[in-house]
């Protein structure tokens, strides 16, 4: 195989770095990819974050493979017009929704970590009264709107679970 180079804007989980020890290639992590320097492109697209660069790549006739990911991600919805309702952009998972954490930091003096730990225990062992663990599948591939982020949130527990599932694709 000829020598090749992989250029990326991030390798947060170190997947490409580990792969580079098994297969010989040059790994470049850059702030911004110069499209004039690439011959082929693979885009892992989630929440349509890369639509603009995909258009640019197609306009330059660079061979491209787009892999659409159905990941869940907890996001902050402070200041949105939808507030405690779902929208096309996100599914509300805070208080008052069936996805909300039944444990509050304001009751019993529990801190954030403790109420998330309690939520995770009930989630892992399917102990909620108003929702079953299997119902959370409905949230796969969605942004999970909450007021906690960027701090730790029960939405992180939900997202981690959903993102660990094999979607068969």
Enumerate the predicted regions with their spans.
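Charged, structured surface patches that assemble and position nucleic-acid processing machinery
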Residues: 44, 63-66
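Catalytic phosphate/metal-binding cores of nucleic-acid and nucleotide-processing enzymes, i.e., regions
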Residues: 1-26, 33-35, 39, 50, ...
């Amino acid at each position: 195989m000829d020598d090749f180079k992989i250029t990326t804007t991030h390798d947060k989980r170190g997947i490409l770095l580990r792969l580079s020890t098994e297969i010989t290639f040059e790994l470049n992590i850059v702030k911004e990819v110069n499209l004039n320097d690439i011959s082929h492109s693979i885009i892992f697209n989630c929440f349509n974050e890369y639509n603009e660069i995909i258009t640019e790549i197609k306009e330059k006739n660079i061979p491209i493979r787009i892999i659409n990911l159905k990941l869940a991600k907890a996001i902050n919805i402070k200041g949105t017009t939808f507030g405690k309702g779902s929208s096309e952009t996100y599914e509300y998972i805070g208080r008052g929704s069936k996805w909300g954490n039944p444990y509050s930091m304001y009751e019993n003096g529990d801190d954030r970590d403790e109420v998330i730990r309690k939520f995770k225990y009930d989630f892992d062992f399917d102990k909620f009264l108003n929702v079953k663990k299997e119902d959370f599948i409905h949230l796969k591939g969605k942004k999970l709107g909450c007021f906690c982020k960027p701090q730790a949130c029960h939405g992180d527990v939900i997202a981690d679970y959903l993102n660990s599932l094999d979607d068969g694709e």
